[in-house]
Swiss-Prot record:
Catalysed reactions, as listed in the record: 2'-deoxyribonucleotide-(2'-deoxyribose 5'-phosphate)-2'-deoxyribonucleotide-DNA = a 3'-end 2'-deoxyribonucleotide-(2,3-dehydro-2,3-deoxyribose 5'-phosphate)-DNA + a 5'-end 5'-phospho-2'-deoxyribonucleoside-DNA + H(+)
Cofactor: Zn(2+)
Keywords: DNA damage, DNA repair, DNA-binding, Glycosidase, Hydrolase, Lyase, Metal-binding, Multifunctional enzyme, Zinc, Zinc-finger
GO molecular function: class I DNA-(apurinic or apyrimidinic site) endonuclease activity; damaged DNA binding; oxidized pyrimidine nucleobase lesion DNA N-glycosylase activity; zinc ion binding
SMART domains tied to this protein: Fapy_DNA_glyco, H2TH
Protein name: Endonuclease 8
Zinc finger (FPG-type): 229-263
Gene: nei
Cofactor comment: Binds 1 zinc ion per subunit.
Family annotation (Gene3D superfamilies): 1.10.8.50, MutM-like, N-terminal (3.20.190.10)
Keyword set includes Magnesium: no
Amino acid sequence: MPEGPEIRRAADKLVEAVVGKTLTRVWFAFPELKPYETELVGQQVRQIETRGKALLTYFSHDRVLYSHNQLYGVWRVVNAGESPETKRDLRIRLETQDRAILLYSASDIEMLTLDTLTAHPFLQRIGPDVLDLSLTPEQVCERLLLPRFRRRQFSGLLLDQAFLAGLGNYLRVEILWQAQLAPQHTASQLNEEQLQTLSRALLEIPRLSYNTRGTVDENRHHGAIFSFKVFHREGESCERCGGTIERTMLSSRPFYWCPHCQS
C-alpha cells in the first residue's frame, strides 16, 4: 500500500494539473456519485490535500471528494481527452480545458461537504499527519507516552493510523532501524534518550522519503529512490554494524531488521 509520502507526492502532481482550473468534464464509476457529474462541471478545483493516506479534493461550491487509495488505487495526470491504455478500472475522471486527473482501482470514494468532512469515520480516527510540518518531535514524544499507546509494541503501533497518520510498513521498518530499536519494545520501556531518538525518526524518515522519492515506476516499490537501510535487504550487511539483515513477519507484514544493532 502506498504510504504517506507517496500519497503526498501524488497530490502534488494533481495540484499542479488542476487546482485553480474550471472543470469541463466529470465522470464517476460508482452510481451513488453519478448525480455529482453535472453539478461539478463549471466548478473550480480549489485545493487538494492529504490526510495520512487519504486524499481530499475541494471544489468551489464546498463539496469535498474523499478518496483512499487502499492497496491498489493510483492517480494519473493526462492531457484533456486522453484515455491511457491500462488494465486498471477507472473510478474518477476530473477534466479541465487542458489536463485531466484520473483515479484507478480505488473503491473507498465519497462525496462530502465541509460540514460533514470532520465527521468522516476515517478522518475522525487518524492521528496527526507525519508530513504536517507543524508537528514536532516533542509532540510525538507526548503521543508515544499516552496511556493508549505507551504499552503497545512498536511492531503494531507504527502501523496504526490512530497513532500517527501516513506511516506504513517500509516506514515502520526504516524508523525502527534508525532508532536502533527492536520491534517488540514499547514506549514505556524506553529511557529519555531513546524516546527522543525515536520521536525524531518518526518525523525525519517520512519527510526524507517524501523529499527524495522519484517518478513512479510500477515495477519498483512505489518508484523509490529513497535509500532503504533494511527494507527488502534480507541477507545483506547492515551498513551501521555489519550484522546480517533478517526478515520476519510482524502484524501480518514482512519486517526487516538487524538483530545485532536493534536491541
